[in-house]
Amino acid sequence: SVQTVSVEEAKNLISREIRRYQNENEKALERIAEFGSQIISGWDTVMTYSASSLVEAILICTKRSGKRFTVIVPESRPMFEGTRMALRLCQQEVKCSLIVDAAISKFIDRANVLLVGADRVTEDTLVNKVGTRGVALLAKAASVPIYAAFETDKFLPRRYLPVVDRQQDPAQICETTDQYLTVQNIYFEETPLDYFFGFVTEKGIVSPE
């Protein structure tokens, strides 16, 4: 027979599951921050791209461990999430250099490591803010190791991957309209996994293989 529960019991069950999920997420975040701090040596210069709560946690954890380092943060247009992350990091006394996105190629040579987040990860690519592939290519050319930080629940078989190149609000880039003007405002793109030196997860630092 089908077991029935009262509305109150259902609410309590849902609340417990939510708390359990939140606790697991918090523990995963702490582990990722600790593992990620291992890839940053004292006096290193870290470049980031876009914004990631995990990358932010790693940098704050590294700062609290006593290591001295600086972070190069591209502004990440059009929503400027990089700028906002840099300001949050400064509040935690993490030294940051904020640059325009177009200056990434000029500053990548100064970095010892490139650290990014991920929105989704498939069997062969990592989905993140558009521009991630470009900065990864620059890092590879400069022999700068590239790491991505994400929880393992970000893995998603490619066949279930949402449309990556969906157009977003063109007014975020240009509010002027013209029949001859097409505004391309795409948020996400895929970067091959073999571009990366390693992945920082709650289970440790793993290689692309």
Where would I find each of the regions flagged by the language model?
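Conserved phosphate- and dinucleotide-binding cores of soluble alpha/beta proteins
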Residues: 63-67, 74-209
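N-terminal active-site beta-alpha-beta segment that forms phosphate/nucleotide-binding
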Residues: 1-99
